[in-house]
Amino acid sequence: MKLCHAIFSTFVVFFVASGAGEKQGESQLQQIYDELSILSRVTNAIALQAAALSKTVKIREVITELLKVDNGNFSNLLSLDPAHLVKNLDELHKKSLQAVSGSNEQLQQDLKEMIAMNGLLAAVESENYTEKATVNSLIVLKKVDEKMEICDESLITIMFNISQAMSGVPFAESDEMKIFSSMKTMKKAFYKCISKFPAFMQKLYEYNYPLSGFLELNDTMNTIKALNELDIANKIPNMLQKFKTPFLNILAVGDHRNKGNTGKLLQSAITLFKKTVYSNSSTRLFLTAGFPESGDMKRVAKDLTSDWFKKKVSRGKSTAELETALKPFNQFAESMAHVFKSWNNFRDDFQTDSALLATIPDLLSQIDDYDRNVDKKKFLENFEATFRTCFKNYKNALDQGEETKFLKNFSAVYLLVRSVQAVEQWASEISTMFDEKAMDVYFEELEKLTPSNIKEQVEKITNFDDFLKIINKFTMLKSLQTQYESAYKTSNSSELSLSKIITDAGLVDTSKCLEKDKLDSSKLLKMLQFMQHMMQLDIDYSTLKANLDNFFELKKKMLETEKLVKGFTSRSARAASNSGSPVLKIKDSQKHADHLGNGLLAIKKMIISLKEKATILKSTMFNAKANQEIREKNPIDYIKEFWTNPGPSIEKLVSDLEKLEQSSKSYRKADLLTIRKVFEDGSKIVGIPEVFSYIDSQFEKKGSQYSNERKITQALSTLDLNFASHKGALSAASLSVDNLKLYFDDLFGLTPKVSVQSESTSPIVVVLICVAIVLVLVILAIVGYGFTSNGRNQYINLYLYYFGKTSDYEKRWRYSLFMDRVDGKNVLIDSVREINATNLLKAVKRGAYINVCNKYGNTALHVATRRGYQNLVEILIKHGADRSFLNPQNKTAEQMIPVNYQETHKEKIERFKSIESIYNKYRKKKFKLCVPEKFPVSSFHIYIEDRTDDNVTNEFTTKFQSITSDEAMITTTHVVVKTTEDGILETDDLNLLIWIFHGSIIVRDTWMVDCLRDEKLIEKDCDYLVEKVKYKGIIYDTVTQWSNAMAKATTPFLYGVHVALCMKNCPYLASLTAIIQGQGGTMLDKFPDKDAFNKGSHPYLHKNLGPIFLLHDGTGDLDLYRSDPDKMFTLFTEQQFMDLLFKREINKDTNPKIIPVLVDEED
C-alpha cells in the first residue's frame, strides 16, 4: 500500500512539474510576449530612472504618454487655475439656494407656462390684424392661371420615353428605334422651351409671393386657438398676483450681484476639459513603450524577482543592487497609480456629464448679463395693469364652425401653394443644370447617330450622363403640371379668410392697445428666463462641482508626482555619482526600451490577429456580388487591385502567423538570444494592406445588403494586418535584445574574462597594414558618404550634370516656383534688380531656373543687359542663360543694348562696350545649366480641398502634420483635390480653380490613400498629378501645362491684356482679379478710355484678340464694343474667359516691331 502511494505521489509531482511552466489556454506566442514584457518593463524602468539621474527626464511628456493624452492640451489644462471661478460659482449658488428655497415644482411649471403665454403676447403685439382681416384667397386666385404650361407635351413625351429606355424598361425593337431617333429632332422644341424660362420664372415669383401669404394665415389661426386654449386673458393677471413675491425674491439675487464673466470663464475651462479628454495622443509610444497598460509600472518590482527574470536574465545572480537602484522608480509608479485613478475619474465623469456641462456656461452668461437697473416691482405692476386694460375688449370664444371652415379651405389652398413651390424649385434646378455650350455639343452628337445600334451610340456620347440627368428632370414636369391643375380646381372654389374670426375675437382693438401702451413682453421674457436659470443652476450645480473637484484632485496628484520626480534628480544624482548606479551603465537605455517595447506591441498585434484567423479566412469566402462590389465600386484604387485576388495573400498571412506560433514553442525553452528570434521571424511576415476598415465603410452605406459580409469586415476593421509596416520595429527589437543581454551579463557578472597574449609584429607589416587601412578608410569614406543624404544628393547631381537628360531637369524645375523664391520674390530677378552678383552666383550655381521672366516678360539676362550690368550678364551667360529668348517686344537679350547708347547713355558707354564684348566672346560657346537642387519633402506645404474623404484627410494630416495645413496660403506647394475615377478634377468653383493658375502642383486624392499605406510615396507626387479639369461640362487637359509654365515663370499669359467688368454681380471677383493679375494682366477699376490704347495693338500672346477684355454677364447692351471698327475690344462671359485660360492657346505676335498696347507705354 505504501509503495503504491509513493508511486502515485511521484507521478503527481512529475505531472505538476512538467506543466508548471505552461499557462493553460494561452498560445506559445502569447507566453513569449508575456515573458519578454518583463524584460521590456525592467528596461523602460532603467531608462526612466537613468534619465532622472542625468536630469534629462521630461516628466510631463512621460506622464501624458502613459495617460495617452495630448501633451499640449494636458499642459494647458494643468495651467488652468479656476479658483476665482469656483469662488464666484459658490457665491452664486449660495444666493440661488436662498432665493429658491421656498419654491417648488409648481412654481417651475408655472414659469414654463408663463414663458409660453408671453410668446403668444409677443405674437399679438407684432401682428397687424387689420391687414390679416382683409386677406381673401378668392381675390388672389383671380390673378393665377388655371394651367401652367412651359414645354410642348410632345417634347415631354419624348423625354419620358428616353428616360424609360435608358433605365432599362423593355421596349419592342422598332419602338426603341423610334424613341432614340426622336432625340435627333427634339433640339428646336427643347430650345423653344428653354427660351420661355425667364418669363416663366418671373410668373412663378409673382404667383408664389401672394400665395405664400396664406401660410401666414394659418400661423395667425394657431395663435388665436392658443390664446383661447391657454385662457391667457384670465391666467396671466392671476399668476402675476399669485407669484409676485417669489418672483421678486429670485430677481433680487441679480440686483445684489455685480456683473461678472463667470459664464465665459467656465466656458474656457470646459473647452480645455473637452480638448484634453477627447483628443488622443499619437498611438506610437516613445518614452513608455514598455508600459502599454496602466498597471504595468507597478509590476517592475515583482518582475525583478520573477522566476523568468532569474532564469533567463540574471541567471541566479542577486538582483538586490538593481532593485535598490530602482526604488525611486517604484515610488514614481505608486504615485502614478494615484494619477491614473484621478485621471480616470475626471475623464469618465466628464464624458458622462459633458452634454449637461456644455449648457451651464450659457446659462451663467445669461445670468451675468441680466439687467440690474430695472425696477422689477414697478414693471410687474405696470405690466399687469396694461394687460388688463388691453384685454378687456378680447373675447375668449372661437366659433367651431368658422374654425372647421377655415381649416378645410386652408388645406385646399395649401396644396396649390406647395404645387407652385414645387414647380419653382424644379425650374430653378433645371436652370442650374443647363449649359448652352454643352447642350450644343450633345445635339451635334445626336445628329450624327446612325440607325444601327443607336442605343449603344447614345451611351458612348461624351458626358451623356449629364444630358440624361436633364432629361430625367424634364420627365417630372408632366406630373407637376397635373398636380398644379388639380390643386387650382380645388382651391378656386375655396374662400380662405380670417376676417370674421378676428373681428369676433376683438383682436384688432387688443393688438392696437398693446402696441400703443408698450406692454414690452420682451423685458418680461428676460425676467422669466433669469428666474428659470437660477432655479436650473440649483439643479445642475452638484454635477458641475463634482467635475471641478475631479479636476482639482487630478491637478494635485499630477503636481505631487512631478515634484516627487524632481526630488529624485536633486537627491539621487549625488548619491548615484558616488555609488555608480547600475542604471547608468547601459548606453542608450531609452532607445532600447523604445525598440523592445514597440517590437512587442507589433507581436501583440500578431497575437490578436492569430486569435481571429478563422474570421480572417472567412473574408476569402464572400459571395460573388460582394466581391464584385469591392472590385468595382470601392473608392480606393489599391483596394480594388488587391481584391482582384485576395485569397492567396490572406491565406499566406494566416499560414505565416501559424508558423510563428509553432516556432515560438521551441524558442521559449532556449536562452534570451534564441528567444529574440521571434522578432526576426515576425519581421518576415508581410501581412496585407489596410483594406477591411475601408470595405466595412463601403458595406455600411449599403444597409443590410451585405449584412453577413459586414459582420466579418466589422470584426477585422480594428485589426492591424499590415505587418510589413512593423518590420523596422521588429528588427530594432531583435538588436536591442542583443545589447540588453550584454548589459545584464555585465551587470550580473556573467561576462567571461578574456586572457590577452602579446605577440611581436614586424614594423614593415605594421606600416603596410596602416597604409592598407588608410586606403580602405578613404574608399569607405567615399562610399559611405554616398549613403548619406547629402552624399547621395551630391553624387546624383554630378551624374545629372554630365549625363542627365532634359527630362531629368524638368522633374526638378517643376518646383522652381517654390525653390527659387525668397519672401515671395524670384531670387534671380531680385538679384539683378539689386545688382547683387554674389546672390545671383549662388542662385545659378544651385540650379535656379535661369530663363525665368518678370511680369513684363523679360528674363534676368534681358534686364541685366538693358541696365548695363556687365558682371551680371557674364554670370548669366556662363551658366546657360538662353541668349535667343524673345521678350514681348520680340527682342533677344543682346538686342536690349540701346542702338545709339554713345548718344543716349553717355554715362554707360564703357559698360555697354563691355557687354558687347562679352556677347561676342561667348557667341559660339554653349554652357551647361547647373543641376537644380532637389525640392525636399520637408518644404512641402500641402492644402487639401473640402470635398475629399474626411477620414482619409484626417489620417493624412495626422501622419504628415508638419507639411499639411487646413488653410490655403500663398506658400502652398500642393493642392490635393477630389477627382473622378479617371483622375479628372470636376468643379465650377473658381476659388478652387485659382490654384491651377497660381502654379501649385495639383494632385489626386488617391495620393493621400497610397501615402497612408506607404509613406515613402509622399515623394512620388509626380505619379498623382491631375492632368485634366472639367469646368462647366467641358474637359480641358492643360493643368500640367499651367503648372510647368508657372514653375518656369514663362512670358505671362495675359501680358498686355486690360480687363474691365461689365457685370451687376460678380461672385468670384476676388478670384478673377487674382488670376488676371497673376498672369500679367491689368484689372481696371473704371471703364477704359479707348484713346489711351494704340490702334492695331494686341496682347503679345494673343495677336487675334483686342487688348481690352470686357467680361460681361449677358445682361447689358455691348453691341457698340462688339462691333468696334478698330477691334480694340474682346468680349467674354466669365465662362468664355475661363475657356480661353483653360485652352491655353497661344497666338504669338511675331512682328519684329510690336505696337505697344498703351499710348504712353515705355519700351
UniProtKB/Swiss-Prot annotation:
ANK repeat locations? 856-885
Q: Which keywords does this chain's UniProt record carry?
A: ANK repeat, Repeat
Q: Can the keyword Repeat be found in this entry's annotation?
A: yes
* Entry-linked InterPro entries: Ankyrin_repeat-containing, Ankyrin_rpt, Ankyrin_rpt-contain_sf, BRCT_dom, BRCT_dom_sf, WSN
Specify the protein name. Ankyrin repeat-containing protein F37A4.4
Q: Which domain of life is it from?
A: Eukaryota
Q: Which SMART domains match?
A: ANK (SM00248), BRCT (SM00292), WSN (SM00453)
**The keyword Nuclease is annotated on this UniProt entry:** no
Residues of the BRCT domain: 929-1025
